[in-house]
Swiss-Prot record:
Substrate-binding subunit of tRNA (adenine-N(1)-)-methyltransferase, which catalyzes the formation of N(1)-methyladenine at position 58 (m1A58) in initiator methionyl-tRNA. Residues 1-24, 305-336, 452-521 are annotated as: Disordered. Its main location: nucleus. GO terms for biological process: tRNA methylation. It holds the Pfam family Gcd10p. It comes from Dictyostelium discoideum. PANTHER family: TRANSLATION INITIATION FACTOR EIF3-RELATED, TRNA (ADENINE(58)-N(1))-METHYLTRANSFERASE NON-CATALYTIC SUBUNIT TRM6. This is tRNA (adenine(58)-N(1))-methyltransferase non-catalytic subunit trm6. Residues 12-24, 452-476, 487-502 have a biased composition (Low complexity).
Amino acid sequence: METETPMDVETKSTTSNTNDNNNNTTIVKTTSNIIKEGDHVILDINNGEKFSVIKVKLGSKVKIGKKQILINSIIGESYYSSFQVSNEKNTLERITQKEIDDRLNNLVELNQNDADNRNLDQNNTAQKLTQEDINEMKQKGTDSNTIIKTIVENSESFKTKTSFSQIKYLKKKIKKYSTIVKIIKPTLKSLTEAYYKKDSRKICGLRFDSFGQLLTLGNIRANSQVLVVETCMGLVTGSIAERMNGQGTILSAYIGKGPSLSIVNNFGFNTDVLNTIYPFNLNITSVLNKGEDISKLPPTASSGIYDKQVKEKEKEKEKDENVKDEKESGEEAKTIINQRNDTSNENIVKLLKDGGVWSLVIVTKYSPLNILLSCWPYLNSSGSFVIYSQFPQPLMEVHQFLHKNQMAVNQQISEIWMREHQVLPKRTHPMMGMDGASGFILYGTKVTKPIQKSTTTTTTTTTTTTNNSINPTKTTASLDIENKVIDATTSSSSSSTAAATTTEEDKEDSESALKKRKIDE
């Protein structure tokens, strides 16, 4: 086991790593990438077949398959190192990628001709060995290489396969009869892949590519104050903390009896980063919005957060009430941290009211509309909000509500989609077993309605002697009715008007004729 070196000293160790181009790579060891006791690491078992998140402790064992394996040998090694499970000692033995590739090549001579698979029969009669024979070799403690080589030699169809099919067959047998473990450093990408592979429902179906849009569209940056509501075991809170790196404030609201931020511990954050996270019950916002007394609420429970004395207490003794074991696919633990004084209800209210928040992130399995309205008063104007859901209908409800009430601009709903590809010589193709879609995102910017000033209009009315004058204060409907009445009256009295006009003309003619007679006389 190597001793820990100072931060400014690098210990270089060259490891031959044979890939498709037969190039050698150099692994540089520094104190930042060396596995130490107390670190959280991810065990990648058989190239993604299974993931397990553990805390490294001297003398502790991890369940891999049906065996309890001692993990002392990984302390002092660099991250992304590979280990092989020893069948005899139940320990992890260091193995390089070159040794893995050489073992694959030395098992059997691969077929280099232009063979194809047209004559293969899918009747399971090509293998001469029975399952009893293979189990007998296992019980005798036969090496995995010997077992695989024996299986290949007793296969009648192996020599007729193409070289690609032979490599695929050998990799499948190596994965079945031997166990290779790679130690991965916990990051947002690696933790998301591990929990997505384990049970995607616990993290609401989030993939690592979803966080690129969540953090960017939510305007997550350093020196900002963010309000997050999630039901993903702390994965979203941890991603925001990783982006902000201890600069800013994260208000993590939870729904229910207590917070669930167990994944935050697995990131391996230092105390400065963890002290920026403030968990609180979402009921606080509802009480504030109603104007009720906040002192009536029970004290806010805190978990997933380190206080200043947590690391010292962990080194001395781990209290039973602060540790909750979770047995899922092996031995894994969730650490619940002591309650902090600065996560009291009064302090949370002060953080919400003093300056508000500039980003609102909602990732939950519940309906997002009520949660959004509860948190909306504390999002500053021009602040960014982003909501994730596995289904588009809840986001449509939020979009329509905000648009109708003119509460947000630049709203858009987008679908998260990604397709992973295998890139190998003459074997490049999309991965057939992955999910294409990973939910939907609604994002936008909060706006405040402008104050509408009341305007007074003055109407001047002129009085005329016309009998059919229209009152300007009447409604449009009454004007239409009166116009129709006037038109009807005009059309019905057209004949009487013409007769009256003729009578007046006759009178004028008779009067003019009388005047002429008087003049002549």
